[in-house]
Amino acid sequence: MNNSKIISKVLLSLSLFTVGASAFVIQDELMQKNHAKAEVSAEEIKKHEEKWNKYYGVNAFNLPKELFSKVDEKDRQKYPYNTIGNVFVKGQTSATGVLIGKNTVLTNRHIAKFANGDPSKVSFRPSINTDDNGNTETPYGEYEVKEILQEPFGAGVDLALIRLKPDQNGVSLGDKISPAKIGTSNDLKDGDKLELIGYPFDHKVNQMHRSEIELTTLSRGLRYYGFTVPGNSGSGIFNSNGELVGIHSSKVSHLDREHQINYGVGIGNYVKRIINEKNE
């Protein structure tokens, strides 16, 4: 058998493996490589570039406010923004999480992994804000973590649950603010516009921002256009009814290696069932 046939068989095997793997393992390098397609029509690339330029074509500070803007102090005290907080893993990373229960925060598995199973390394700071002068405000305090459920949805799903301790007065965070209302991603369709809320660390430290995102496909989870940077991992995705329908995960190759797209985990029936079972 010549080398070209051997290579073809190997590539076919890899493709079959990737198709059979979980749709949500978006951090996996092999999956990212397989998003890079060898043949993409000029029309597809043009459409993608137009969307990409709309959301990323200018400096973030110059994006229209309806596409990307800081959440002001007044709104940070309102739903759903007050359910959003900074997930801080000491000495490792800073990301985002969403309060979904009295003591439960939903974030990404790849963020929770940084703690190596040690809850003492993690804290949750809802509605934290650091102004441009470096002054930091934590209106609901800083919550220590009691338990990390790193893979409650399975190893292939980029979601994790963090269970919080009550504050020093014995008050749970969910007694101070209403947790996010859990919706479903089942009713979403291509072209829908949603709101992504989180803490884009690479843009501004400890400043909550909202982004308008536009779904481009529901294949292999949620894919969408919208301004995101590191720190947005774990950001909540909300529909127009204020229901949590997904969690932002990452940005990976899309049409080819030069074109990226945002990926998120939708809250479908399976995810919603596990949330209901594990929520506290």
Curated annotation (Swiss-Prot):
This is Exfoliative toxin A. The keyword Ubl conjugation does not apply. It is an enzyme of class 3 (hydrolase). Residues 1-38 form the signal peptide. The active site is at 110 (charge relay system), 158 (charge relay system), 233 (charge relay system). It comes from Staphylococcus aureus. Keywords: Calcium, Hydrolase, Protease, Serine protease, Signal, Toxin, Virulence. Belongs to the peptidase S1B family.
